[in-house]
Curated annotation (Swiss-Prot):
It comes from Mesobuthus eupeus. Transmembrane segments: none annotated. It holds the Pfam family Toxin_3. GO terms for biological process: defense response to bacterium. This is Antimicrobial peptide MeuNaTxbeta-4. Its main location: secreted. Antimicrobial peptide with weak activity against both Gram-positive and -negative bacteria. Its antibiotic activity is potentiated by other antibacterial peptides such as Meucin-49.
Length: 72
């Protein structure tokens, strides 16, 4: 059995390098999170970004490797 380490964080828009944005749509974030291997996603309203639990690290936005250029 091989385990894959999962994490929690904001979903990464791989095209822009930014967080995947949202307004109040938990369904959209939850669906996107699950498509990326997570188990639950929601729109974190204060950051206007999709937060995902249980996704692979490569699917998540990280401050240290931020390539968004201040857009979000």
């Amino acid at each position: 059995l091989i385990g894959v380490k999962t994490e929690h964080g904001y979903l990464l828009d791989k095209y822009t390098g930014c967080k995947v944005w949202c307004v109040i749509n938990n369904e959209s974030c939850n669906g996107e999170c699950k498509r990326r291997g997570g188990y639950y996603g929601y729109c974190y309203f204060w950051k206007l970004a999709c937060f995902c639990q249980g996704a692979r690290k490569s699917e998540l936005w990280h401050y240290e490797t931020n390539k968004c250029n201040g857009r979000m």
